[in-house]
């Protein structure tokens, strides 16, 4: 079987609300850490989520 190029990552809220999303990313194409603006349902606002490994 072929080795997968995708790794699981956790996107953690920068607001400190302990909310997170999980997703995968291609480790060969995306070398830098991922940072996305997503909705945080705990504080009911859009905030920046930053990548951490699972």
UniProtKB/Swiss-Prot annotation:
GO terms for biological process: translation. NCBIfam families: PRK00595.1 (NF001860), rpmG_bact (TIGR01023). This is Large ribosomal subunit protein bL33. One of its GO terms (molecular function) is structural constituent of ribosome. SUPFAM superfamilies: Zn-binding ribosomal proteins. The lineage of its organism: Bacteria, Pseudomonadati, Pseudomonadota, Gammaproteobacteria, Enterobacterales. Keywords: Ribonucleoprotein, Ribosomal protein. The gene is rpmG. GO terms for cellular component: cytosolic large ribosomal subunit. Belongs to the bacterial ribosomal protein bL33 family. InterPro entries: Ribosomal_bL33, Ribosomal_bL33_sf, Ribosomal_zn-bd. The keyword Ribonucleoprotein applies.
């Amino acid at each position: 079987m072929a080795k997968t190029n995708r790794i699981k990552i956790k996107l953690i809220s920068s607001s400190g609300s302990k909310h997170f999303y999980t997703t995968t990313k291609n480790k060969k194409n995306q070398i830098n850490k991922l940072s996305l603006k997503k909705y945080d349902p705990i504080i009911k606002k859009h905030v920046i989520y930053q990548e951490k490994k699972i």
